[in-house]
Amino acid sequence: LTIALFEVVASLRLTGTFDPEEITAALCRVPTDQWRAGQAGPAPKLRRRSDGWVLESAAGAGHVGEQVDRALDELAPISDRLRHTLSARETSGCLCVAVDTDGQGRPVIALSAAALRLLAASGLSLDVDVVSGATDNPDPATPVIQAASTGHPDGPFHRTVVSWCAEDAVSAFLDEWPDRSMASQDRPGGEILVQAEMSVGSFPSMYFHPHLLARLASTAMSLRIETCPRTT
């Protein structure tokens, strides 16, 4: 199976109530951008509602999962400092991943078990935003999203939800996963596959809260998100 390459930009974004210079000192990293609440935003008439600090990795064409791994490799040395910074301040942190398809396909979001562990250890959320560039109006119908696992010893385990959010399917899956009582080191690994039936130009919301990433990391499984054409 050939997975298409797309332009991907990953960035660490911290927002909340803090002095950006203190974040720079705590993480020992020079930000790509920073701002204080009340400063002008991207549009002249908009004002920032919170303080912000952004560290962007270089943009590049590649598989989405590989680019996420690259960004996390850069964050790995400061994972402990990052988690302490988030817990010690009124601050939330997110690894934001922008994927530009230029209307040329449907990206596959593949996250390794190691990537999920590092995200969980750092206390970050994950937000994958797909920019399709499609000119067609997206179908407003709510998509059907299925989550299945190859990691259960008794065979595949499935859950289906009707939602715009991939997080809902993963959460419903984990709530009833038969292996949830097992210790992660005793689990056989495997993959959680999320498939969303979408119209052309539409993609599910792929925002994952820190607590759900921690639950995912505890399964010792990887996560794969695919979109496929709507069948009805």
What are these model-predicted stretches?
Residues 1-232:
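Acidic (Asp/Glu-rich) sequence patches and key acidic residues
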